[in-house]
């Protein structure tokens, strides 16, 4: 059985408590270890704009294109495979 690490827990600061509860249960049921990346939780408008500029997000963070991350209503995860983060869809499907 897996459990969320200290960094993943810290990366969920400011997120809706219901999402935290879901992540806590999901990690115990998952077939593969996973974590929450540093940009996977609550984001400021500036953080969101940078992710958009880097091509990582489709939402630019402005009033017309806000991300649910900006209100704490979204959480990103990565699969933890062979000692490193993976965003491979095959790995993510196992979570």
Regions found by a protein language model. Give the residues of each.
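Cell-envelope/glycan interface and biosynthesis
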Residues: 1-95
